[in-house]
């Protein structure tokens, strides 16, 4: 392994109810390969798989909790082994919270503590805290989540573990055809079927909004300009608020009948408009289908 192939590994552990699920989701948003509840005895084998991935798994987050408590002796050995591998950059993130906070969270979710499935949550919390003493001592980072909302925990993790590029709010702008269905991952959907349709001009029928003749045709109409003015104003207003609420990306879908002409033209326009301020990815889901409107 060379420096360029170094693997960044984060082991997420801590008190049950302290936010490990939110933490794993946050790392997933940052592009980490995430595994929850990996038995420590499998960690050496997992490391071998990472080494063989040829850079495809260069950021990994592993969630370990008390469902694997009988394997803690294996964990200590695996952690010692990690320290000897110079091409792995290991971090242990320990999530903690006050006993009273954890009790409240268990009551709110009506779940049993894993160490007190039939008893009081506090008994399980006390036993777990004792069991995790050594793990907490070995942690690189300890986060107290007692006063953190899920969004605030995510923001802390993003701040601690992401690069400047990874912190960028990503905007995906895509065109689609309603005849093929609305994209299931779309956050915002705009219907532009009210605009004049180049499909009915014979020589434009086989073209798409990526062709200058089609885009010029769509953009020449007054209603197109008015719509784009209102659309860009709306999106420009909304994006900072979505970012503030903790979203890592926003998918904006613009649809026409077949996803060939109007939606493609406007998607290209919106993408270019947003790129100076945001990390933007433009895609055209149905542009290759060319099945007609």
Swiss-Prot record:
Gene3D superfamilies given in the database record: P-loop containing nucleotide triphosphate hydrolases
Q: Does the keyword Nucleotide-binding apply?
A: yes
The residues listed in the UniProt record as binding ATP, with positions renumbered to this chain, are 14-21
* Matches recorded under InterPro entries: P-loop_NTPase, RapZ-like, RapZ-like_N, RapZ_C
Q: Does the keyword Nucleotide-binding apply?
A: yes
- Could you say which residues bind GTP here? 65-68
Instruction: Tell me one Pfam family matched here.
Output: RapZ-like_N
GO MF terms, alphabetically ordered? ATP binding; GTP binding
Keyword tags: ATP-binding, GTP-binding, Nucleotide-binding
Protein family (similarity comment): Belongs to the RapZ-like family.
Relate the protein's function as given in its record: Displays ATPase and GTPase activities.
What is the name listed in the Swiss-Prot or TrEMBL entry for this protein?
Nucleotide-binding protein BCG9842_B5683
Q: What is the lineage of its organism?
A: Bacteria, Bacillati, Bacillota, Bacilli, Bacillales
């Amino acid at each position: 392994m060379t420096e360029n192939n170094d693997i960044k590994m984060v082991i997420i552990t801590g008190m049950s109810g302290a936010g490990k699920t939110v933490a794993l989701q946050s790392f997933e948003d940052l592009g980490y390969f995430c595994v929850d509840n990996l038995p420590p005895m499998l960690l050496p084998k997992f490391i071998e798989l990472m080494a063989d991935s040829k850079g495809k798994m260069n950021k990994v987050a592993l969630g370990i909790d008390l469902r694997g408590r009988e394997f803690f002796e294996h964990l200590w050995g695996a952690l010692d082994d990690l320290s000897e591998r110079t091409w792995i950059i290991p971090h242990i993130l320990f999530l903690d919270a006050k006993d009273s906070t954890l009790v409240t969270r268990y009551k709110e979710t009506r779940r049993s503590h894993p160490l007190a499935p039939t008893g009081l949550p506090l008994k399980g919390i006390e036993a777990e805290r004792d069991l995790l003493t050594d793990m907490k001592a070995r942690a690189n980072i300890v986060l107290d989540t007692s006063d953190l909302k899920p969004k605030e925990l995510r923001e802390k993790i993003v701040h601690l573990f992401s690069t400047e590029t990874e912190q960028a709010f990503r905007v995906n702008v895509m065109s689609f055809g309603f005849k093929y269905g609305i994209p299931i991952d779309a956050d915002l959907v705009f219907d532009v079927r009210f605009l004049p349709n180049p499909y009915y001009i014979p020589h434009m029928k086989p073209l798409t909004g990526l062709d200058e003749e089609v885009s010029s045709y769509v953009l020449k109409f007054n209603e197109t300009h008015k719509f784009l003015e209102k659309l860009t104003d709306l999106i420009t207003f909304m994006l900072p608020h979505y970012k503030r609420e903790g979203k890592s990306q926003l998918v904006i879908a613009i649809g026409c009948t077949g996803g060939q002409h109007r939606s493609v033209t406007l998607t290209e326009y919106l993408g270019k408009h947003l790129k100076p301020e945001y990390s933007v990815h433009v895609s055209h889901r149905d542009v290759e289908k060319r099945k007609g409107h």
